[in-house]
């Protein structure tokens, strides 16, 4: 209410209104405010068990003034959006690249790594293969693309671990 009243006073004296501070809310999948006591939603620490800090940064970067739904099932979509932004960055010219959120998330050092598959597809592979270890999942991945290695694809290698953990905790 203070901000509303201040805005009216500023307008009356003919001055420019200061920008108001937007308080960002985090919502669960039903659109209700996340609460520790209810245990709804996902914590930042939980997100970081299932996905990279960069995917969370991108998720937070988009629409900064809008309340965000923060629950476990949103993680795969957010990771896929992050991977898509990395892929798009490879072919973007300077001005387009500046508009790409991963340029900011990575402080202008966008990864050059080629993405092998989406996180959603990786989760499907975990489910259909019933892989419960990185080594086993990498064997299936190498059947899909034989000329790759964990060392050449460090981002994807981390995704492999995240996918197994996410599948065990959320999907299974």
Which role does the model predict for each range below?
Residues 1-7, 11-14:
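Divalent-metal (Mg2+/Mn2+/Ca2+)-assisted nucleotide/phosphate chemistry catalytic cores
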Residues 3, 23-167:
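Catalytic adenosine-cofactor/nucleotide-binding cores of aminoacyl-tRNA synthetases and other
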Residues 15-16, 53:
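Short, well-ordered coil loops that connect the C-terminus of an alpha-helix to the N-terminus
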Residues 170-172:
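C-terminal low-complexity, glycine/proline- and small-hydrophobic-enriched intrinsically disordered tails
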């Amino acid at each position: 209410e203070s901000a509303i009243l201040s805005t009216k006073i500023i307008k009356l004296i003919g001055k420019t209104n200061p920008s108001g501070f937007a308080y960002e809310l985090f919502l669960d999948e039903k659109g209700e405010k996340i609460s520790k006591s209810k245990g709804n939603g996902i914590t930042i620490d939980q997100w970081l068990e299932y996905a990279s800090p960069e995917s969370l940064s991108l998720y937070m970067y988009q629409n900064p003034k809008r309340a965000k739904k923060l629950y476990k099932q949103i993680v795969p979509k957010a990771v896929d959006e992050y991977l898509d932004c990395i892929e798009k960055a490879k072919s973007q010219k300077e001005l387009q690249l500046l508009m790409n959120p991963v340029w900011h998330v990575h402080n202008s050092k966008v990864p050059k790594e080629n993405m092998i598959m989406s996180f959603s597809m990786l989760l499907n592979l975990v489910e259909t293969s019933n892989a419960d270890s990185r080594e086993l999942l990498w064997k299936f991945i190498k059947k899909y693309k034989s000329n790759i290695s964990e060392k050449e694809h460090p981002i994807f290698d981390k995704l492999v671990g995240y996918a197994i953990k996410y599948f065990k905790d959320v999907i299974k």
